[in-house]
Regions:
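Bacterial Sec-dependent signal peptides at the C-terminal "C-region" and cleavage site
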Residues: 3-13
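Cell-envelope and extracellular/periplasmic
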Residues: 11-259
Length: 259
């Protein structure tokens, strides 16, 4: 009876969120001095040992597929997690597993694995095979679900697929990805899937964002988060720190309001 009580208590301890996608989920917002030393209140990261640890930037540090640690920055996960903790009063566990420069096809179940590069990846990983994005998302999410209920799958990706020659078929690929992910995690449609638009000043945003906005026609229990009014770094690809913070609040508000 005692073991059962401890197990149940552990499973109810955290609200768990799977945070996946490409560079804007990994984070490219520039840090403020306190970001990398001050833990977020009530927010935890699933570490490389599968344990919850206090969340300190960069939040994508424990991703098993990430690019080099120096490339990681502030993402929407920062304010999203803070907001969800403030609204619920419960501890939030982020399962961060994003990688910059990745296409939707590279996230599909069974997609061919690629290799780490020799530029922006950690030197100790150069030319090694990168673990399957899909398999690692499932594996790490399951590890996180040992500590609480999976509350949402939080996604930001699309820049790599926004070119006119790549945009066709994106929604059907995303639909398959979400269906497989929910199935393999054993959660079905009860767990929301949340996706946000790319930087509004990006040259491909006028075509990509309206397409993604119709996500509800493709994926049950899914929400689109508008990026309108948000600003980017000088590269016009990545959201700046201030906009990442606002974006995360929009994600949290949408999830809390169910729309």
């Amino acid at each position: 009876m005692l073991l059962l009580t401890v197990a149940c208590s552990r499973q109810e301890e955290y609200d768990v969120y799977l945070m996946i996608g490409q560079s804007n989920m990994a984070g490219r917002g520039f840090f403020e001095p306190t970001d990398t030393v001050t833990a977020l209140n009530g927010v935890y990261l699933l570490d490389s040992e599968g344990l919850p640890v206090p969340a300190v930037e960069p939040l994508n540090r424990y991703s098993t597929i990430r690019k080099g640690l120096p490339t990681q920055g502030v993402s929407l996960a920062h304010s999203f997690a803070e907001q969800m903790h403030m609204q619920s009063g419960r501890k939030v566990l982020l399962v961060m597993n994003a990688r910059g420069g990745t296409s939707i096809k590279s996230w599909l179940k069974g997609a061919p694995q690629s290799r780490y590069g020799t530029g922006s990846d950690d030197p100790q990983n150069w030319r090694k095979q990168i673990p399957s994005f899909y398999d690692e998302a499932v594996r790490r999410a399951r590890e996180g679900m040992a500590y609480g209920k999976l509350k949402a799958i939080v996604w930001h990706q699309g820049e790599s697929d926004s070119d006119p020659g790549k945009i066709d078929g994106y929604m059907s690929d995303l639909q398959k990805f979400v269906f497989d992910l929910r199935t393999d995690l054993g959660v079905g449609e009860d767990v929301p899937f949340i996706a946000g638009g790319i930087l509004p000043t990006h040259q491909n945003a006028p075509a990509f964002n309206p397409m993604l906005e119709k996500i509800g026609d493709w994926i049950p229990n899914s929400y689109f988060i508008s990026s309108e009014g948000l600003a980017g770094n000088p590269d016009n690809l990545h959201f700046n720190r201030e906009s990442q913070i606002e974006f995360g609040r929009r994600y949290a508000s949408s999830l809390s309001n169910g729309k």
